[in-house]
């Protein structure tokens, strides 16, 4: 993923900015799976590998729908669903509140669906997808597991309410640990500024690993903690 320019890690220099995650925590490292999956070769490779793992996990059972959450999860879930032979693919949409999701697809009672994410940090995003689908289709059935290209949390995070994540890349299992902090963030304490729109200024952010003084003109910053 580093070869795909998908990995940012804070240099340790307080003059360089760091990143705020969607859950509001600060972090000293982040992997933007968008950059990795934008390569069609990577997308095909990851799709095939994910389909193999999820098909094995299903154990002969068939899902009726594959769903992806906005935005990067949609093409990944769609291609994995096609590879698995799942008859229908869908997605949720964000509302005015950046965290809320809605589902516009109607499903018959008893319809089984599988959530496939490109990444999850805590399990909150896939749970919001599941909630949105079940609100629209209370008779549908969510499988007891989801797929994910990459996770930086445990495989049964509390936010996912008991469901298991089947990942391709499990950062904790690989020993890759990026710190997360709340109000006690040591980088904030040292004067490092917090970028809230990292994905929108990604390549500028990568430059700060070598040049901590690099100016990111379109960065949005959180208030100092």
Residue ranges: model-predicted function:
Residues 1-59, 200-203, 207-225:
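Active-site-facing substrate-recognition patch
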Residues 52, 56, 82, 131, ...:
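Short, well-ordered alpha-helices that flank and scaffold nucleotide-derived cofactor binding pockets
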Residues 64, 111-113, 144:
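Conserved acidic residues
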Residues 69, 116, 147-149:
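Short hydrophobic segments within beta-strands
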């Amino acid at each position: 993923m580093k070869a795909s320019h998908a990995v940012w890690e804070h240099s340790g220099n307080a003059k360089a900015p760091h990143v705020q995650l969607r859950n509001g925590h600060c972090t000293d490292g982040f992997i933007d799976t968008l950059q990795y999956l934008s390569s069609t070769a990577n997308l095909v490779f990851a799709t095939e590998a994910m389909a193999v793992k999820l098909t094995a996990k299903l154990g002969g059972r068939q899902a009726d729908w594959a769903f992806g959450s906005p935005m990067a999860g949609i093409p990944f879930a769609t291609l994995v669903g096609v590879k698995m032979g799942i008859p229908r693919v869908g997605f949720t949409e964000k509302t005015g509140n950046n965290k809320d999701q809605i589902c516009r697809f109607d499903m018959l009672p008893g319809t089984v669906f599988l959530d496939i994410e490109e990444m999850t940090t805590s399990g909150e995003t896939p749970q919001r997808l599941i909630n949105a689908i079940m609100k629209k289709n209370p008779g549908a059935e969510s499988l007891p597991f989801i797929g994910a290209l990459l996770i930086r949390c445990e495989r049964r995070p509390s936010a996912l309410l008991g469901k298991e994540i089947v990942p391709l890349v499990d950062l904790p299992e690989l020993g890759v640990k990026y710190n997360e902090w709340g109000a006690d963030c040591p980088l904030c304490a040292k004067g490092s500024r917090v970028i809230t729109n990292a994905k929108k200024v990604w390549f500028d952010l990568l430059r700060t690993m070598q040049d901590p003084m690099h100016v990111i003109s379109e960065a949005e910053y959180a208030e100092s903690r």
